[in-house]
Amino acid sequence: MYFIKLIYSEIFYRPLLNGLVFFTSMLPGRDLGLAVILLTLIIKIITFPLTHKMLHTQKKMKKIEPEIKKIYSENKDKEKQAHALMALYKAHGVSPFSGFLALLIQMPLLIALYQVFWKGIPFPQSELYAFIAAPDQVNTLFLGFIQLMQPNMWLAALAAILQFFQAKLALPSGGAGDKSDTTQRALQFQMIYFFPILVFFIAFKLPAAVSLYWTAMNFFAIIHEAAVRRQAVSDGKQ
């Protein structure tokens, strides 16, 4: 258990804390809100290879969807289905579980960010690297009226709305697929409608800085998804 806590602290919590302190110290007015947005952008850049691979996997899965349905209809035996699907994925260079890694990384990041603000300001000097100095003062008012150290309903709502649009955009163009595929349709419904509601109620209980992180992360994800879609359309016209 100690080893797991050490890994979590050194890979997620301390880098996140020190990055936030660094940006806060460097920004004019010691603006914590801008520091959270900058830190989110850095995290997005670091995780870009994983999320980019996940998006391309989704596009490939959409292309081979008719072949997947054919395998399910022609092979009623579960073992034969599994072998046929693995052969199909290998032939098209698709790893259906590659996207889960990007999603799994988000959870410890959210927990670590919550821990950073739960401990509050001033930042714990003992957790900072030797070359990072905590600022004497920190501006915790984002846009002049949102207190980032306290829950904020409006920022939580914005995070949920962007989560909705991000999930909607992530769906393959062409709808929810075959109506007979009730499992797929149920999962898509949960991702589009239920998960944003869950995001709102979770974010509403946490410091607004976490909501700001969630909002910024979804905003950058929407831009990324839109760029990938535009590239796919451009490639299709060539």
At which residue positions do the language-model features occur?
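Helix-loop-helix
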Residues: 1-238
